[in-house]
Amino acid sequence: MSGQTLTDRIAAAQYSVTGSAVARAVCKATTHEVMGPKKKHLDYLIQATNETNVNIPQMADTLFERATNSSWVVVFKALVTTHHLMVHGNERFIQYLASRNTLFNLSNFLDKSGSHGYDMSTFIRRYSRYLNEKAFSYRQMAFDFARVKKGADGVMRTMVPEKLLKSMPILQGQIDALLEFDVHPNELTNGVINAAFMLLFKDLIKLFACYNDGVINLLEKFFEMKKGQCKDALEIYKRFLTRMTRVSEFLKVADEVGIDKGDIPDLTQAPSSLMETLEQHLNTLEGKKPGNNEGSGAPSPLSKSSPATTVTSPNSTPAKTIDTSPPVDIFATASAAAPVSSAKPSSDLLDLQPDFSGARAGAAAPVPPPTGGATAWGDLLGEDSLAALSSVPSEAPISDPFAPEPSPPTTTTEPASASASATTAVTAATTEVDLFGDAFAASPGEAPAASEGATAPATPAPVAAALDACSGNDPFAPSEGSAEAAPELDLFAMKPPETSAPVVTPTASTAPPVPATAPSPAPTAVAATAATTTAAAAATTTATTSAAAATTAAAPPALDIFGDLFDSAPEVAAASKPDVAPSIDLFGTDAFSSPPRGASPVPESSLTADLLSGSGFHCAEDDRHVPLFFTAVDAFAAPSPASTASPAKAESSGVIDLFGDAFGSSASETQPAPQAVSSSSASADLLAGFGGSFMAPSTTPVTPAQNNLLQPNFEAAFGTTPSTSSSSSFDPSGDLLMPTMAPSGQPAPVSMVPPSPAMSASKGLGSDLDSSLASLVGNLGISGTTSKKGDLQWNAGEKKLTGGANWQPKVTPATWSAGVPPQGTVPPTSSVPPGAGAPSVGQPGAGYGMPPAGTGMTMMPQQPVMFAQPMMRPPFGAAAVPGTQLSPSPTPATQSPKKPPAKDPLADLNIKDFL
């Protein structure tokens, strides 16, 4: 039948039982079958992203969970499914992915199950890096390059130069990560990697179309830019030529594996003289500043340029309005600058026309403006012309002896005044629609930072990962929870350099200088026909550097790209790195706090939610706060009440379960076990012989985090109730051990149902006064045997006033209410508050009808033994202070509100009569 494993079926069945059809579809799309995800499951998930009631974070978390599988098939299919949803699903999906700190932490993934697993693991690591980069680009740009409009009135063609210089390195970084997949036709051996390759191929066509539009826009405005901007634009153009070679190789693989040739665009090369012209213009700006405006044919400062350069209407291309500048003047001035360029090594590493003199001589007569030429070949990869361009022959770049290696070329830092692009770049028109908000505006406190390193094309990151992109109030700052990601894979621990103060300009030091032999540097004529204009478009594969994307452009500082789109509060980052110590402030108002937001999709009570609560992300679309990590297991949300204390012992005999509750229950004190004290038994003092080892009072309760972490007893926590409660109290009504509320607030289990009042009364007092008296005599008599040993172990200040004359048995009241303080009159000596007396947790204090410690009362020597067991209530043999009463309630703080009954006949008895 199918190749699904039993694990796949069980996982799908589990989600079916829980009712999550989306998660079930994810499991079905990521089975162990060595084939691409089935279309029916992908279509279902795509439809689910368009539904308003579908939880996008849950869908993404299920995909991430499947990507942690040990099998390369499941992981690869999870990546393919995620990519498919990023491309074809609702934009909410990629928005959510962009909001996360980390996506796929697969930089070290390796499936050792077989040789095929080793091979596929390599592509899984590269593929996950590209998906991370794709989401990162969306975060920086607030749009997906593959989704935006392309062509003459597309986004990249109508973008103002300042933004264009910022966006092109980001786009270059995404293309670099895609090209790094670097698969060969003989490696496309199974349906899973084939599905991934098809998605990458389609992405590359769209991304390169955007890339081409951006380069056209740069060339159109090149002669109107300031010097620093021209320098950045020239570097971007050089990198474009390098990437064009690699794109051609990728498309060649697509051709070999059988993709329809009509879907593969034919990339043709631009004339080499175009690069020379651009370099001469830049040299003119740097060497002959007075002739700047005449040489460029347009005013240099963009803020003073004509409105033609800042056309905001998407229906008109800027190129059509820039042609007003006299083109011949541009190149006449450039001709005068020919000696300057001849002294500089040729940047054209891949020039396929070594006969520069002949090429220039033939092209000297018809000199078109470069902007017009760029406009003509600008639609190379437009949506409608992709298929029509297959007939245009492309020059083979393989025969070139100077083809650049993938390693970065020798880079030298040119301290030319490139910082002007960062400091003096002014927005051309204030009415321009700002796609980026203030994303790329340097904050006032930022100093210009050196652009760190032209990285090799093998690196998908736009810059070195050492740059901390998340400094400042970045709402996406990685918190401690994402520290497990490898540095190169922590998706957003990198950003382009702050500004372009010293620009690292990769020069053509690896190529021999080719001096210009002709004084006329005019480019070759660009005809208006489709074939030649396309040839001009894609530009020659003359690459001077294979440096990766974001080095020379004035790059964004710590940026808040989604300031408007996702409405992140800037102060979110302040809470993104809390202390990871396990001591959680349960009652602090800011332990789990974050800026005001909508309802969170998941409970934020877990420890992980505490650590990461500040890194939330507010989606403006449906007004909800999306925490960054949704797979955190909430280990502390619902403590099991059954584990609070062991079941109460209901035997009527006097046998004591010494260790059952002491070591079986997760109570809040590590004190002796509660004792089942029988009113007719003399076994109450079996623990007395253990002395201080069992009786040492604990002043600070040990709180088990797994039980009572999130169910606080606020009264006990804030000191409004005496801290004398123990985890189990003696129930005078039936020899039962009734667990009580610990100071740390552990919940009372269902078994803590108080017995009926009638039974309490009958059992508590015994059948008559004789049995009660016998119980009193028996308990006190046996206690005396070990009283001195216990007294030695006990503090002198812990003594309580007891005695036969002071004991008043009370009839058990019919009802009691929780939290009512005792109404019995406390003796004047007990006026010391429990906090002042500092009674230990196990010590019976005022809540037991006993005065606190240190009140200076006289006391019988055997009484410390009776009350040394910190988890039991005093037996009836113990005398209470006159005016107080024994409480039958589950907690010492919940005393009966009944008034004390009339004087009891036993009140006149003295303990001395029985000794």
UniProtKB/Swiss-Prot annotation:
Q: Which residues are glycosylated?
A: 310
What keywords does the record list, in alphabetical order?
Cell membrane, Coated pit, Glycoprotein, Membrane, Methylation, Phosphoprotein, Protein transport, Transport
The record's section on InterPro entries has: ANTH_dom (IPR011417), ANTH_dom_sf (IPR014712), AP180-like (IPR045192), ENTH (IPR013809), ENTH_VHS (IPR008942)
Q: Where is the composition biased (Low complexity)?
A: 410-425, 500-511, 720-735
Task: Relay the domain remarks.
Answer: Possesses a three domain structure: the N-terminal 300 residues harbor a clathrin binding site, an acidic middle domain 450 residues, interrupted by an Ala-rich segment, and the C-terminal domain (166 residues).
- Quaternary data: Binds AP2A2. Interacts with AP2B1; clathrin competes with SNAP91.
Role description? Adaptins are components of the adapter complexes which link clathrin to receptors in coated vesicles. Clathrin-associated protein complexes are believed to interact with the cytoplasmic tails of membrane proteins, leading to their selection and concentration. Binding of AP180 to clathrin triskelia induces their assembly into 60-70 nm coats.
Name of the protein in question? Clathrin coat assembly protein AP180
Recorded source organism is Rattus norvegicus
